Amino acid sequence: LYIDNSPLKSSMLSTVLQKGAIYALLVVSMNLLNGFTGLFSLGQAGFMLLGAYTYAILTIPVDQRINVYQYFDGGIVQFQMPQIPALILAGAVAALFAALIGAPVLRLKSDYLAIATLGFAEILRAVIQWEKLGPLTNASNILRKFTGYDSILFPFIVSGVCIAIIVLLINSTYGRAFKAIREDEIAAEAMGINLMKHKMLSFCTSSFFAGIGGALLAMFQFNAHAKN
């Protein structure tokens, strides 16, 4: 049996595995909402975008900001956060936006919910590239030079921890409530389950991990851009 151990082959395998770990987290986060709670949302890309931009904005070194924000005098953010706090904050910002739009959109059903969340993602993509927000988001220009990861194990560890947390949530009393809502909302409400509370929890949790996944993808790609 001949195995090609060339640097190119190992590099390609590493790339595929890293991207696979990141997308595994994104798929599991989406499955929490679509599969276990029965909410057909297509807004995951928007929350990934929020996570990627939040992480990138917060971790660009101060001395590099003038090069990244060359059209906006170095931007308005003039500090650099450590990697892990910035990663958590990336998820938190995505969850915050999910909470803001959750109250109106989670009252919609089926295709209407899908259209509303997809519309949110597209509007967000356009807003981030708005010239007026350039000092923060760099408008339509690429965000780069932010903190990446040194070890290829990093995305596997982060994704593994996040997926484990999601699995624990699914197997908890909250997870059983999510499944009850998916099967029959009327019966779930008759059993004393607060529909809006649990829908919002599922929506925000899914968005939180989508934001972390978006930040990991930005690190993997070495840049963040609304078109990616």
Task: Give each language-model segment a name.
Residues L1-N228:
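Transmembrane alpha-helices and adjacent helix-loop boundaries
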